Amino acid sequence: MKMNKQDLMDMHAIQALTDADMQKVNQTILAQINSDVPMVNQLGFYIVQGGGKRIRPLIAVLAARALGYESDKVATCATFVEFIHTASLLHDDVVDESDMRRGRATANSAFGNAASVLVGDFIYTRAFQLVAQLQSLDILRIMADATNVLAEGEVQQLMNVTDPDTTEESYMRVIYSKTARLFEVAAQSVAIVSGAEKSIETAFQEYGRYLGTAFQLVDDVLDYSANAAALGKNVGDDLAEGKPTLPLLHAMRHGNPQQAALIREAIEQGGKRDAIDEVLAIMAEHKSLDYAMDRAKQEAKKAVDAIALLPESEYKKALISLAYLSVDRTY
């Protein structure tokens, strides 16, 4: 399906197309976050009702509809993937000592580190309970592998923090592990549960991988280019945390010796925001944000190409549109 930009759906159109399915997913999320332990309920509801994009469940819903597949298992797939993502955010915010996400206090800021870690553990294990309901060893395998890879990505990112010698390859590996792999699972699990051919499963796996990579690249650009209200977190958090993301690595690699030294020091120090204006100026001079955005657009195009074999439908059109929308956003 060759589409011009004016033919693409906007997010409102995609949401309208999937409204009934996403309502079912949200109902499943709320039902499955429930616990007899009050703190689990309180913190769990706080995090799942925190205004997230729900893009992983959306991918699962669109993939199922593109295959003409209808089943309660779709909501189960969408929910277990969202739970893995949600649990990882709870743990992430503790590790990063973050105090703001999606425009409000993080769970660790509101409830404390111990509660956030433990409820994150609960949500992880609830995800595995949901997978067990699907009675599919293939889905269990990809979910277990993805969770393991995600954990490795967290550790790799921790190793990269305050390390200005982090390579672009290492950075991209973290993106795949922490973000793209779960996007893969969102689409691939639906293909498996629907009984689709292996070629379709592979196509959705690749779509998720490339879309997830594009999505995270844009997130890392927005950390330096958005405003805090739109972004839902503090601008420049990555620099303050000493995270060497692609825009920063590009600026350091292409800057003159003085500029490179300034960025190296900013990464090594971490936790300081006083260098942000100088770093932004260096990025602007060397078009580092443009470089990262170009990489994101390449990944989005790969995502679109990956699902070329799907039959034409409004849902395929929505999947294509979602790939391009992932790089054309301000939050």
Name the predicted role of every residue range:
Residues 1-331:
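All-alpha prenyltransferase/terpene-synthase fold signal
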